[in-house]
Design a protein with these regions (language model features):
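Flavin (primarily FAD) cofactor-binding/catalytic cores of flavoenzymes
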Residues: 1-45, 49, 93-196, 200-350
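FAD-binding beta-loop-beta segment adjacent to the flavin cofactor pocket
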Residues: 54-56, 67-71, 344-350
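Short alpha-helical interface elements
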Residues: 55, 63-66, 109, 242
């Protein structure tokens, strides 16, 4: 919610910084617990979650039960099923027989939970956190204290340093895709990044109607293939509480090794997306050939992007097997290169 009923309260058992999915889950689970006075503050004016990546047809990559609270407390008032019931659409949702939840629906569910929870406050930014027997928090509106704090400020878009100075209307991170994809007709588009977001952009461009479609789409990935997400049964055991407890006790080098070995449990492409892409490529290559120039290149590492002639971009990359340098001209470059941890400048007092 944008206003707080707790403006007069200055001390809390728990104060959360940020109200994205992680802290929103915590806020949902401690809601109504009298022994746990709590407030969650977010500097944004309202809830948002990858709003500029809500491509038509994009779906969630995990089970609907992996919502804010079901696996911890199925009776909690902020479950996805509670959202469907509150909105009067639970029967329609069941009858729709979705194989995967529409991502926009899940985004709306998260926004609903944030609005329903009066302990979640938007438009209040934490500026500094200090500690003197209790945590002392300074926001853009007031000063508070708390016995415990939960940091959940999320991540921010990542691009290589050499690209950051060139970001704009024709070269941008995928997090800006819905803002800046309106002028692809007749253009050469290069997508960099072989994960789910890169796959969704590639599929979206392939599916653009005739007359609005790019003349060429070039998709580059460092990986050896466009690998699927590992959502198999035993792999999902990694995300059970018992394994989390075990994992947290491992030494740092083993935790890092485990994360590297299992990156495709969270960073692969949905099977349904891969299937749609392959079927679309089949149609464009064999049924209606010659309409668009398509290139998929794996085992390539982009080393630079330079301004070329006629306001184009020259994308330079290395073949990881042969070490040969290659390049491609593009009118539009989309970086689907993931996210990195947000800087926590407000912790300077600690």
């Amino acid at each position: 919610m944008t206003g707080s009923r707790k403006d007069v309260q200055s001390h809390f058992k728990l104060l959360g910084v940020g109200a994205g999915p992680a802290n929103l889950s915590l806020a949902s689970l401690v809601y109504g617990k009298q022994e746990m006075s709590n407030i969650f503050l977010d500097g944004k004016s309202s809830f948002s979650w990858h709003d500029d990546q809500m491509i038509d047809g994009a779906t969630l990559q995990v089970s609907l039960f992996k919502d804010l609270s079901t696996l911890t407390d199925p009776t909690n008032k902020f479950t996805f099923l509670a959202y469907l019931h509150d909105k009067g659409r639970i029967y329609h949702f069941i009858n729709a027989q979705f194989d995967e939840i529409p991502r926009r629906e899940f985004r709306n569910y998260l926004a609903w939970a944030a609005e329903k929870n009066e302990n979640v406050v938007f438009g209040e930014k934490v500026l500094n956190v200090d500690f003197d027997n209790v945590f002392k928090i300074v926001t853009n509106k007031r000063e508070l204290t708390a016995d415990n704090i939960a940091i959940g400020v999320g991540t921010q878009p990542w691009v290589p340093e050499f690209a950051s100075a060139h970001l704009g209307q024709t070269q941008f991170h995928v997090s800006k895709y819905m803002q800046r994809n309106s002028s692809v007709a007749g253009k050469q588009v290069t997508i960099i990044g072989g994960g789910q977001s890169g796959a969704e952009v590639f599929l979206d461009l392939l599916s653009t109607p005739d007359g609005e479609r790019p003349v060429g789409i070039h998709w580059i990935s460092r990986r050896r293939n466009f690998f699927p997400i590992d959502d198999s049964t035993f792999t999902n055991d990694f995300y059970m509480p018992c394994y989390s407890d075990y994992f947290n006790k491992l030494p740092l080098h083993l935790r890092q090794q485990t994360n590297r070995e299992n990156i495709l449990t969270s960073d692969g492409i949905s099977e349904s997306t891969l299937r749609q892409i392959y079927q679309k490529l089949y149609s464009l290559n064999f049924i209606t050939p010659g309409q668009i120039d398509i290139a998929l290149q794996t085992s390539r590492s982009v080393s630079n992007v330079k301004l070329g002639g006629n306001n184009t971009w020259r994308v330079e990359y290395c073949h990881l097997d042969s070490a040969d340098m290659e390049s491609k001209e593009a009118d539009i470059v989309v970086w689907a290169t993931g996210y990195t941890a947000t800087e926590k400048h407000f912790l300077g007092g600690l």
